[in-house]
Amino acid sequence: MDRTLSLEFARVVEAAALRSGRLLGRGQKDEADGLAVDAMRQAFDSVRISGTVVIGEGEIDEAPMLYIGEHVGAGGPEVDIAVDPIEGTNLIAKGQNGAIAVMAIAEKGGWLHAPDMYMEKICVGPRGAGAIDITKSLTENIQNVAAKMGRKVDEINLVMLDRERHYGLMKEARDLGARIMLISDGDVNPAMECCIEGSGVHMVVGTGGAPEGVLAAAALKCAGGDIQARLKPGNEEEIRRCHEMGVKDVNQVLTLDDLVRTDDVIFAATAITRGNLLNPIQYFPGGARTHTIVMRSKTGTVRFLDTIHRDEKLTTLKAR
């Protein structure tokens, strides 16, 4: 993909964040999500790609826009797109930290077509890459990652969703002496954060959404991190969907290269609320300021865009 597309993709996630961020703290998660979807879909109209949504808002009968299989873009190279217009709709509704607008783009056929079900994951940044094995205990993984990173176990920070299903993992990590940062929603954001030195996130573990696992893998692919995962179908219907998506063995350990099947990936995310890495949207009379990360796997480049937007210039977000 042309590297100049990186800025175009940044504008897409900025549009989603700017539109939905107006509903911060107002308890309207569905309305915020709708605004983000509308803005993202509109912004795609000016991007010079022929894109197909592979991971999006749901099946064609579940979502009016950005549904799986929808074609977007103004024409150009064929790409597959993974989007989450808002990761953390509850976070926006409650005015809490960690909400982002996020997308990733790969050459055609570049993504695992992850079904909408649970996925067990373990993620690390570049310094921990190669040290994880999802078939081993959390204790072994923490110890191996700590050794690879040159840290003591009690200096390792793990992020996991605050869910009852993770209580056993929490106890195991704490008994070992590792530190846990619990989050209420959204595991793409911390996976992105563990890629960057100084974010304070070293590992992301636990079970979350499978589509989010692919987006997390995109960030890790771009920045040199690592992930292992396993799908966790809950019934026969979900097993059937795994088979339809090309996953014949639902117990298969999925590596980074299984989730992201190309070296040509661009990842972009804009903060809506504050994170460990990105600053929140700041609105002011006549405009706003956003903080965006854009990563490209071919070069390993990570860019942070601190951007001022003027309302009178942003009527349509069409190419200028």
Language model features with spans:
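A two-mode feature
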Residues: E236-L277
